[in-house]
């Protein structure tokens, strides 16, 4: 498994738009490297005779009836919104026209 270095963490931070200091980048790189090595050691623990599972217990979803409860009107929902337009929340664009 390749080591996680400061440059990879800096790239991920840039993609996530997170500002990090050099000290934070170095610390997070070390922490991520420890996590990756721990996960790698776990993946080696199960041999080829162990079937892959998503959960060790046979759990099933428990569904409930979909019952409509109290709801806000459109006006009530927009009451504390900093900005709205045409009955909808108005937020700053984040994708630069994509």
Swiss-Prot record:
Pfam families: GatC
First-tier enzyme category under EC: ligase
Highest taxon in the source lineage: Bacteria
A GO molecular-function descriptor: ATP binding
Reactions listed under catalytic activity: L-glutamyl-tRNA(Gln) + L-glutamine + ATP + H2O = L-glutaminyl-tRNA(Gln) + L-glutamate + ADP + phosphate + H(+); L-aspartyl-tRNA(Asn) + L-glutamine + ATP + H2O = L-asparaginyl-tRNA(Asn) + L-glutamate + ADP + phosphate + 2 H(+)
Keywords, sorted A to Z: ATP-binding, Ligase, Nucleotide-binding, Protein biosynthesis
Biological process according to GO: regulation of translational fidelity; translation
Cross-referenced InterPro entries: Asp/Glu-ADT_sf_sub_c, GatC
EC number in record: 6.3.5.-
Subunit structure: Heterotrimer of A, B and C subunits.
HAMAP family in the record: GatC (MF_00122)
Similarity field: Belongs to the GatC family.
Function: Allows the formation of correctly charged Asn-tRNA(Asn) or Gln-tRNA(Gln) through the transamidation of misacylated Asp-tRNA(Asn) or Glu-tRNA(Gln) in organisms which lack either or both of asparaginyl-tRNA or glutaminyl-tRNA synthetases. The reaction takes place in the presence of glutamine and ATP through an activated phospho-Asp-tRNA(Asn) or phospho-Glu-tRNA(Gln).
Official protein name in the record: Aspartyl/glutamyl-tRNA(Asn/Gln) amidotransferase subunit C
The species this protein was found in: Kocuria rhizophila (strain ATCC 9341 / DSM 348 / NBRC 103217 / DC2201)
